[in-house]
Amino acid sequence: MRLLKVATCNLNQWAMDFESNMKNIKASIAEAKAAGAVIRLGPELEVTGYGCEDHFLELDTVTHAWECLKELLLGDWTDDILCSIGMPVIKGAERYNCQVLCMNRRIIMIRPKMWLANDGNYRELRWFTAWKQREELEEFQLPIEISEALEQKSVPFGYGYIQFIDTAVAAEVCEELFSPLPPHAELALNGVEVFMNASGSHHQLRKLDIRLNAFMGATHARGGVYMYSNQQGCDGSRLYYDGCACIVVNGNVVAQGSQFSLRDVEVIISQVDLDAVASLRGSISSFQEQASCKVKVSSVAVPCRLTQSFNLKMTLSSPKKIIYHSPQEEIAFGPACWMWDYLRRSGASGFLLPLSGGADSSSVAAIVGCMCQLVVKEIAKGDEQVKADANRIGNYANGQFPTDSKEFAKRIFYTVFMGSENSSEETKRRSKQLADEIGAWHLDVCIDGVVSAVLSLFQTVTGKRPRYKVDGGSNAENLGLQNIQARMRMVLAFMLASLLPWVHSKPGFYLVLGSSNVDEGLRGYLTKYDCSSADINPIGSISKMDLRLFLKWAATNLGYPSLAEIEAAPPTAELEPIRSDYSQLDEVDMGMTYEELSVYGRMRKIFRCGPVSMFKNLCYKWGTKLSPAEVAEKVKYFFKYYSINRHKMTVLTPSYHAESYSPEDNRFDLRQFLYNSKWPYQFKKIDEIVDSLNGDSVAFPEEEANSNKEIGVVAANSGDPSAGL
């Protein structure tokens, strides 16, 4: 047997905070060494933090990374352990995203990333160059300060692996695993048995299985030990890096770290037998044949042994059941951990939420409640960093600290019901009930006086006073009156957030939380600069459909039973007067359902459908219930209002990224914000197709016509009804 103990980790790094990042790196190495591990893998760009963005273009960022690495190598941190450290490196005129492989106070080699992530939220090609020289390793001259301190002038640089006496180890960096021809396939044929994947991978609902399947698939047919490390937490932007460090052996997960956690450092250890890798490879004929004619990959020889022989005191790690969270748990824990990092790192003393008693703001309140529960649980487990942060934020003194989530919420969470003459007693009651269940400090504010003052000023200036639609007013008057209420709520929210701590003799300031969902952003069903305008928004990238399922789950699992009643209530903005024959409803106002909006959103973003492609595909999805002409009207109606309201996305509050069809304007969904909302060419093409059908409908087999399967598209213009979403 060749027994090998390896360690990987989740680290809660913060972009550009070299001091705290180094503290976490050192803690993870110390824990790995204490457990007897001889390999330690850290996350991608762990020294600087993955999310530095344009700070990567600054020479200071690279210089400081080298200074931090020098500090590690001058100490005993790398003694008797191979450490993979992620940091940017400049070679010549190019900047590379690198894993620096160190051992015994020396740099063994530097492995630059070859395939960069450049889609979705990723933009690595803006800051880094992909390494394309695969033939052989080059010599890299270390910076003068580093070479003098380490007494090491140069190191191998490029694509290759480390050949120890008893095994071979190589790095594979994040996106490379998901490329069409991943490096681990070629490296395995060259005899590499241990793969180290340093990653900066962010959370997205229902995404984890894709990642884990890739790890397992990498070693299922080729054999090997696959180590994965990731950041965990908010490192300064809309993304939450969701950890889940893991170790996979021959396709089986033998260790898995948490996906959501408040901890700064989490190290997982595994004891593996490399002979099991050799045995599997020797049993696969095709592997043997391909290995015999492999393309040779360069290596660096290290005269050192990593493994131990048969030893009954060393227990092998066994395959474990993979832990997956439900989407409802992901909505609870991901944004809760993200908000905790934002709160403790911003210097704020708490949150303020305009709580209307509706589904969206109640979801945000529940997530804050979940955050408070997680804080108390982590303190009970003995996490001193969480305890110190909670004591500062909650203004605890005399040895006290949070032991009850409701008591902690009372210290850090204000909720405000900003009612008007258009608000119902039901939403007012539900708002107060939920706040009490969470433990928030709740206020009930009537905004009628403020709205009336604004209207009086308008009447003084113009000589006219607008009326609601139900009172005979025009659409322009009706919309203007609704927007006044919404915008006054934003002004009051920020005023209360800045002054309530002063009123209650508390230090600091409060962050205002927004509560618009992804579907409302897509449709533009929100007032520009209303309560959707806040400091941060934990649900801005989550669909209404998912939020309603979350509310049902949270009513029981978070202990907030009023959420069940809130979920069952029809969504309403309560910005128009309630009459016996009229009550404002969101879906009526929008002219489409939230379920339809989810479909439009997925087709527009995930499957890259323009108006014509969306129409064609929806003819298949909705063909049993709607005629092509009816589908055409729905598609045109959506694109009309999407384009009219697109400008609102440019100023929307920074939101937690959770959904693959988010219309978030900062990076994920880059589009113009001035459209011809009539879409004359595209809508004309749709009309021509409808006319050419002569009233025909889509022909479905009987079993498909009666089924309720998902949308039948794989890409724009696919037109394939058998392809499921």
Curated annotation (Swiss-Prot):
Gene Ontology molecular function, alphabetical: ATP binding; glutaminase activity; NAD+ synthase (glutamine-hydrolyzing) activity
GO annotation terms (biological process): NAD biosynthetic process
Domain of life from the UniProt record: Eukaryota
Chain spans, region Ligase: 324-709
InterPro entries: C-N_Hydrolase (IPR003010), C-N_Hydrolase_sf (IPR036526), Gln-dep_NAD_synthase (IPR014445), NAD/GMP_synthase (IPR022310), NAD_synthase (IPR003694), Rossmann-like_a/b/a_fold (IPR014729)
GO cellular component, as recorded: cytoplasm
CN hydrolase domain sequence ranges: 4-274
A family per Pfam: CN_hydrolase
Active site (UniProt): E44, K113, C174, S356
UniProt pathway annotation: Cofactor biosynthesis; NAD(+) biosynthesis; NAD(+) from deamido-NAD(+) (L-Gln route): step 1/1
Reaction(s) catalysed (UniProt annotation): deamido-NAD(+) + L-glutamine + ATP + H2O = L-glutamate + AMP + diphosphate + NAD(+) + H(+)
Keyword annotations of the record: ATP-binding, Ligase, NAD, Nucleotide-binding
Protein family (similarity comment): In the C-terminal section; belongs to the NAD synthetase family.
Name of this chain's protein: Glutamine-dependent NAD(+) synthetase
The organism of origin for this protein: Arabidopsis thaliana (Mouse-ear cress)
